[in-house]
Each structure stands twice: as C-alpha cells, then as structure tokens.
Amino acid sequence: MNEKRKIQVLCIDDSALIRSILKEIINAQPDMEVVGVAPDPIIARDLIKQTNPDVLTLDVEMPKMDGLDFLEKLMRLRPTPVVMISSLTERGSEATLRALELGAVDFVAKPKLGMRDGMNEYADQIADKIRAAARARLRPRTASPAPAPAAASPAHAVHTAHAVHARPEHDAAAVPAPARTHFSSTEKLIIVGASTGGTEAIKDFLLEMPPDCPGILIVQHMPAGFTTSFAKRLDGLCRIRVKEAVHGERVLPGHAYIAPGDMHLSLGRSGANYVTELDQNPPVNRHRPAVDVLFRSAARNAGANALGVILTGMGKDGAAGMLEMRNAGAYNVAQDEASCVVYGMPKEAVAHGGVHEILPLHQIGPHVLARLSAHGRVTRV
C-alpha cells in the first residue's frame, strides 16, 4: 500500500454512538480516514464494493446478520483486515475469540460505562490496531502442510523460514502422540510473549506440547475478562492444562499459565519452586500485562533454565526483556516474518540481539522440544 495514501476504514456497528466515536477517532489521525459507516452487515456489503476499504471495524453482535457470520463470509469471499469491536462480557469475549479464529486481526473492547470517554481514552490504541491491521498478513484458512521435522538443524530452520508464506492450522487430533517423550526435570520453563495475531499463534504452539512438558508462562496482550475465556478455550483444545494465572501458585510441568488481563505476570521463586506473581504496577510499553515484565523476571529467576519464545505482535514489548533473558543464559526463539500476522515484536527482539533462532510458527513447538531434548532437558524412551 502506498505510504502517502491514507488507510481507508469502513466502520460497521449498530450503535450510532459507536459509529460516531470511531469516526471522530479515526478521522483525527493523519494517516487514516473513514470512507463509510454502516449499521449492519447487509448495508456494509454494498459499501465494501463501493469503497474497497483497507480495514473494517466490525461489531460482534448486530441485527440482520451476526458479526461472526458476516466475518466468516467475508474471509471466504473477500479477505479484508478486520478489527472487532467487542463488549466486555463473557459472551462477548467468547465471540471475540471465535472472530480471531476466523481471521480477524485484533479487537477493541467497548467500555461498560461512559462509552464516549472510555473509547476516547483508548484512541491511540484503536488507531494503532487499525494501522497494524492495514499491514497485517491475513491467515489463509486452508489445510496445513505437515510440520517440519523437530530435529532440523538451525541452518536448515532459518533457510526454511524464508520459504514459508502461510501459518499452518493444526487440529488437536493431528498432533503427534507424546508417549515417546518424557521430561526429566521440573526446573525448566518455557516463557512466551505475543500480541496481535497471538491468540491463534499461542494455540498452535501449545497444541504441540506433550502433557509432561515444562511449565509455560504466557503473556498475550488482552484486557481483563478476555483472558479467562482464552484460557478456557485453550484448555479444552490442548493436551496440557491451560489456565489463567493466580498469584502465588507453583508452576507445574504440563501446565500453561496465562497472564490475566490488566495484571502483570512475573516468575518468582519460593524455595526450590517457581511460582507465579501478579501485580498491577503501571503499564510497561503501554501494556499491562507486559511481555517485558515476564521476560525480565525469567532472566532474574530462571536464567539458563528458561527458553523464551516471542510470537506475532505489533510494537516492541518483549525485545528488551528477551535480551536480558539471553544475557542470563536463556535460549530464545522468534517467529519469522512470513508466518506473523504482524512482524513487530519478533522483529524488535531480533534487532535488540536477544534471539538465537528465527523460525516459522509451525516449526517453533517441535524445535523447542528438540532443543530441550538435545540439552538434556528431556529424555526419550
């Protein structure tokens, strides 16, 4: 897209107030403009043909046609970057996760009270998400190729990264059985950070993990409420236990702990055990939870026992913390540009010098397991 051309945005929402607020926020930005608004998907279909927008904002729940039904048809017939506008309810969060699964790039949570003030408070975030969506790589919803062999050499893996153009979709039933791999230590940890596009990337990564894998701590940029539904969704799909982190609980093998929305997640120590720590200290890199907070705590408390993974996302959160992890002895992997929805956080982590290996998403899980095995962190039987 020509950088001098403004990002063309079409807003679809049954609330006249939301349409008005979004129009004000978007048109106030120097690099984007609203080319149309629609109260429902039926009217939006004609406007899409007329205006050919770069990005859509789409309400989840609307009359005449549900936002998810419309999104599914859109991604099949006319793939377009979409930012969902979602309510802060359990139903809204579950619908949003489904939208991200269908191909939406990101979402904005509607405030429960004070709609205009609440939306305007996040004007910069809304604009950033639209910018990220405009340059995002949409995920084709097609059958995936078989994952590359887990034991691929680093040189081969980096070479392969340049040849991958789409992130494979994995079915839980298709993940290889874990019976041949047993982890011999509970002291090793996998530390993961992600943002835009991360919900699906995290799902694909966790689907590769066997029930006896090291404990996994995860920060995905999400508001409060959404992480609860996210953890429940993953727990129903994966062979490991996935849960929202609780302050002070012991980190166990075969478990993944997701940072709650609006809470920083850190790795702590209690005697010989690793524990989760939560706090509401100020946002870092404009985020709470922040990936840098988790990564830095892993550098302090786990050192070489940690293996870091940074996945798709906009911005630079995690880059400084990943370098600290590397300097403390951790081995770190970044998702490659071709398989990222937005190549921001991995790019910054690479630029900072904190990354050992750059891999396409479908190779990261197998590579992590192979790395743990090769360094005595797992035993194969």
From Swiss-Prot:
Post-translational modification: Phosphorylated by CheA. Phosphorylation of the N-terminal regulatory domain activates the methylesterase activity.
Known EC number: 3.1.1.61, 3.5.1.44
Residue positions of the active site: 195, 221, 317
Annotated GO biological process: chemotaxis
Main enzyme class: hydrolase
Functional description taken from the UniProt entry: Involved in chemotaxis. Part of a chemotaxis signal transduction system that modulates chemotaxis in response to various stimuli. Catalyzes the demethylation of specific methylglutamate residues introduced into the chemoreceptors (methyl-accepting chemotaxis proteins or MCP) by CheR. Also mediates the irreversible deamidation of specific glutamine residues to glutamic acid.
Domain CheB-type methylesterase residues, every copy: 183-375
Underlying gene: cheB
Comment block on domains: Contains a C-terminal catalytic domain, and an N-terminal region which modulates catalytic activity.
Pfam families in the cross-refs: CheB_methylest, Response_reg
Protein name: Protein-glutamate methylesterase/protein-glutamine glutaminase
Source taxon at top rank: Bacteria
Cellular compartment(s): Cytoplasm
Cited InterPro entries: CheB-like (IPR008248), CheB_C (IPR035909), CheY-like_superfamily (IPR011006), Sig_transdc_resp-reg_Me-estase (IPR000673), Sig_transdc_resp-reg_receiver (IPR001789)
Response regulatory domain boundaries: 8-125
Family: Belongs to the CheB family.
Main location: cytoplasm
UniProt xrefs under SUPFAM superfamilies: CheY-like, Methylesterase CheB, C-terminal domain
Family matches, as PROSITE patterns: CHEB, RESPONSE_REGULATORY
Keywords: Chemotaxis, Cytoplasm, Hydrolase, Phosphoprotein, Plasmid
Source organism of this protein record: Ralstonia nicotianae (strain ATCC BAA-1114 / GMI1000)
